[in-house]
Amino acid sequence: MEVNHVELVMSAVDPAQYPTTGYPEIALVGRSNVGKSSLTNVLINRNSYARTSSQPGKTQTLNFYNVEDQLYFVDVPGYGYAKVSKTEREKWGQMIETYLTQRDQLRGVISLVDARHAPTEDDIQMYRWLAYYELPTLIVATKSDKIARGKWNQAVSQIKKSLELPNTDNIVMFSAPKKMGKDAVWNWIEAQAFGGE
């Protein structure tokens, strides 16, 4: 998709605040600091539209980005950040669950994991939860440029084993600085958002 116009239209905490335009939505989930904002910026051809932060736990709302008046990217609060209080984590969890299970416009979820490490327990729980609710999910392994290309197969195998992924499921190796994996992610987004049209 050619992207020239992007707008952050809403930061929501409950369904009453969600946009009402009816465009298909793609949610981005992952633990704090895994690179959701960096992925968003690469996908929309901006350097710093979605704010990247070295401070985990920064996103505390569902941020709806209108892309070309055709779809929304929904940046979901990062999970697994220890310094956030238990009450705060539970509140985020409820907000995220409400959105992911009740939003009719949701067409798919991009679940981000760090290519350099085995998926965390939080990553595994999130993937199982998405699978339980039968939400179409693409696994994107971020920060792939930080590991030698010769070790990619090993990284993919580790992710598939930890998440118990079927062999048919693809994992996109992604690097924000090199914009590597961008086309593969967009192909999946377009198939999910507009495939039935």
UniProtKB/Swiss-Prot annotation:
Organism: Levilactobacillus brevis (strain ATCC 367 / BCRC 12310 / CIP 105137 / JCM 1170 / LMG 11437 / NCIMB 947 / NCTC 947) (Lactobacillus brevis)
Similarity comment: family membership: Belongs to the TRAFAC class TrmE-Era-EngA-EngB-Septin-like GTPase superfamily. EngB GTPase family.
Residues that hold Mg(2+) according to the record: S37, T59
Cofactor list: Mg(2+)
GO molecular function terms attached to this record: GTP binding; metal ion binding
UniProt superkingdom: Bacteria
Matches recorded under PANTHER family: ENGB-TYPE G DOMAIN-CONTAINING PROTEIN, MSS1/TRME-RELATED GTP-BINDING PROTEIN
Entry's Gene Ontology cellular component terms: cytosol
InterPro entries xref list: G_ENGB_dom (IPR030393), GTP-bd (IPR006073), GTP-bd_ribosome_bio_YsxC (IPR019987), P-loop_NTPase (IPR027417), Small_GTP-bd (IPR005225)
Domain EngB-type G, residue spans: 22-195
Protein name (record): Probable GTP-binding protein EngB
Binding annotation for GTP: 30-37, 57-61, 75-78, 142-145, 174-176
Role noted for this protein: Necessary for normal cell division and for the maintenance of normal septation.
Annotated Pfam families: MMR_HSR1 (PF01926)
Keywords (A to Z) from UniProt: Cell cycle, Cell division, GTP-binding, Magnesium, Metal-binding, Nucleotide-binding, Septation
BP term (GO), one: division septum assembly
